[in-house]
Curated annotation (Swiss-Prot):
Cofactor: Zn(2+)
Location of the region described as RNA binding in the Swiss-Prot/TrEMBL record: 248-254, 272-276
Protein name from the UniProt record: Queuine tRNA-ribosyltransferase
Family, similarity comment: Belongs to the queuine tRNA-ribosyltransferase family.
Catalytic reaction list: 7-aminomethyl-7-carbaguanine + guanosine(34) in tRNA = 7-aminomethyl-7-carbaguanosine(34) in tRNA + guanine
Manner of cofactor binding, per the entry note: Binds 1 zinc ion per subunit.
Residue numbers binding Zn(2+): C305, C307, C310, H336
Active-site residue list: D90 (proton acceptor), D267 (nucleophile)
Amino acid sequence: MFSVIKNDKHFNARVGFLNLPHGRVDIPCFMPVGTLGAMKGLKHAVLEKLECNLMLANTYHLYLRLGIKTVEKYVGLHNFTIWNKNFLTDSGGFRVFSFSDLRKIDLKGVHFKSHIDGSYHYFTSEGIFAMQEIFGSDIIMPLDICSSYGIDYNEANLYTNITTNWASSTFKSSKNRKEGYNGLLFLITQGNFFKDLRKRSINDILELDSPGIAIGGISVGEPREKYLEILEYSFLLIPKEKPRYVMGIGTPHYILNAIYYGIDIFDCFNPARITRHGSLLTDNGIMCIGRKEYKDDTSKVEKNCICTLCKRYSRGYLRHLIKSKELFGIVLASEHNIHYMFRLISKIRAAILNDDFLNFRTSYLKKYEEENFDE
């Protein structure tokens, strides 16, 4: 199921692969976010050419926007979307708990009010697993509570305990799955920013022995130093035999630091989101295409990129599209940023294989200032 090909000599970075029902996924792996079964503005063909073998979709949004019965009629999310690669489906818990005034938690699940039409719903840990089983998800994520930075210890302790209980009931559901379904369950560790809670959460989750482990509840507004502290602390408690997934990170500097600490999988919608403001990822840092200096610029965004934008169009033309709020500009910029992320991951893999990860990481981070990103 999971194999490591090469460990970095000096750090915890590693290269390997994960065998899933719809094909092999190489690690480290950046997972693009296709909330409703597709990336905004991008054809599946773009991702297929990039050899993207794992996309994230969101159970909460699919449940509210589409409905489980529709997916069931199509015999799964893969058939419905005509995506023949792997899906990881998040429970949507982060989204539910972000609406603090629209939800109520109990020991079995969460009552919430739809942000779309005001209808009332109830998610349980068992129900979330059943939905993702209907989806045919290749990786299932359980219901969990992603608590915000700055809450007190007692509240964090309560949410950690509830998350562990939900993980246990989800794990039991996974043992009674329908015949022929081979999706992997990755259980989520929580604990907010209290190390004793993190340690207890990880130990409790490890006792269940799920195929993979996710670190949740970081990169939620905390200072970068606190993020790195909890990331390193959590990593040291997770056995190397398990694939490790940090939820909700995806900017280049966060990815490089996560890989440094031995993280294998990450996701983020940031590469697509920043295109709304005309921000492009390049080897020389963030390019803000809306600046006046690019108005008459006939050159390409990046010479060594083979995306549609860089093969055909100028910086000046893209600036015109973005400033005019033309959808085509967002599509071109999104494709470029996704190309960039996959190219970056490929370079990182090569650096690890060549025992050059330290030099690569150091030189790369010099080009990217923290203020250029909004994680």
